Amino acid sequence: MNFNKKTIEDIQVKGKKVLVRCDFNVPLKDGVITDENRLNGALPTIKYLVENGAKVILCSHMGKPKGEPKPELSLAPVAKRLSELLGKEIKFAPDNTVVGENAKAAVAEMKDGDVVLLENTRYRKEETKNGEEFSKELASLAEIFVNDAFGTAHRAHCSTVGVTDYIDTAVCGYLIQKELKFLGNAVETPEKPFVAILGGAKVSDKIAVINNLLDKVDTIIIGGGMAYTFLKAQGYEIGTSLVEEDRLDYAKEMIAKAEEKSVKFLLPVDHRVAAEFKDVEATVTNDQNIPTGNMGLDIGPKTETVYANAIKDAKTVIWNGPMGVFEFENFNKGTIAVAKAMADSNATTIIGGGDSAAAVNILGFGDKMTHISTGGGASLEFLEGKVLPGISALND
């Protein structure tokens, strides 16, 4: 995939109508936005366009309204809060058809530097099917398309891909530019030693990532529920821990492949365990084996040291997926240890979105990381080496 895409700075935007696909899929509680990270992430691109005299038309999805208007998933609260953050009025066009009379009238009245926000693009059934009609309607509003929603870049929808069939100038905003710079460089030209840390519950979710990264990394660190499938494949006792029986052969194969490529494949050497899936006091095992009747819920203290040392020696580190059941206070120690080791390191540190991003932010290490990806599924597909339709649709 080509990572050198044209950006907003490569084109003339003054006086032009610019449709910007943002990611405003934010959590709401009683109409109030509870996490503003994505709004703040969109500001640099919006500010640049406003300051350079563009007529800025913003669009985004929120939640899964399943192709029909749901008042609780309206973007009205986003328009209100974004206006405050931007320090400038954003006109909201409340059309259930997204591109309706309100939107057309609002866009027709725009002056240079004005901002309009359209309604939730997923109010339209065709959005997720990349339907031609809705793509044309969105495109009819603008002369330039800017994609700045990395979180949906792996989806071929009307507002991410379809519009580019009808608008010739399609470029990326600052957010996608940053994702391409850090994730793209890490995957294609990382500074070595390159360490990938993979956690989370299932091996099956990370198969393609491990496959792709084995050709690029020096060390792979495995934690979370997926570690027990690898340990069982090597003959260790795992008690009642999570295991994917149908992936044991694959796990053996991966370990052999890593050895063949001289990639260090680090698995836990001890665990924090409990008799049931509850936030109870942890018992620490002596070694890789987990006693009968117990389940592994986090990596142990010896493992933390081994993993921290591997991170300390790295020049590039990518992390995707927690080391244990992070929601339980007794079993979040491994995740904290990895986050701390990354925060203390001099390497380029990249958090691959999703749970790891949430963990790092909750722990207060967010500002110590080089880059925290804004895409969960998109980051994973990127690390799998897949072409992301929302990126490939933009001008080279």
From Swiss-Prot:
CDD domains per UniProt: Phosphoglycerate_kinase (cd00318)
Major site of localization recorded for this protein: cytoplasm
Binding positions (substrate): D23, F24, N25, R38, H61, M62, G63, K64, R122, R155
Enzyme Commission no: 2.7.2.3
Subcellular location: Cytoplasm
PROSITE patterns reported for this sequence: PGLYCERATE_KINASE (PS00111)
Positions with a binding annotation for ATP: K206, G296, E327, G353, G354, D355, S356
GO BP annotations, alphabetical order: gluconeogenesis; glycolytic process
Gene Ontology CC terms, in alphabetical order: cytosol
Keyword Signal: no
Enzyme class, spelled out: transferase
Superkingdom of this protein's organism: Bacteria
Pathway: Carbohydrate degradation; glycolysis; pyruvate from D-glyceraldehyde 3-phosphate: step 2/5
GO molecular function: ADP binding; ATP binding; phosphoglycerate kinase activity
Swiss-Prot/TrEMBL keywords: ATP-binding, Cytoplasm, Glycolysis, Kinase, Nucleotide-binding, Transferase
UniProt catalytic activity: (2R)-3-phosphoglycerate + ATP = (2R)-3-phospho-glyceroyl phosphate + ADP
Entries under PANTHER family matching the protein: PHOSPHOGLYCERATE KINASE, PHOSPHOGLYCERATE KINASE 1, CHLOROPLASTIC-RELATED
The family this protein is said to belong to: Belongs to the phosphoglycerate kinase family.
Quaternary structure and interacting proteins, as annotated: Monomer.
Protein name, entry field: Phosphoglycerate kinase
Organism of derivation: Clostridium botulinum (strain Eklund 17B / Type B)
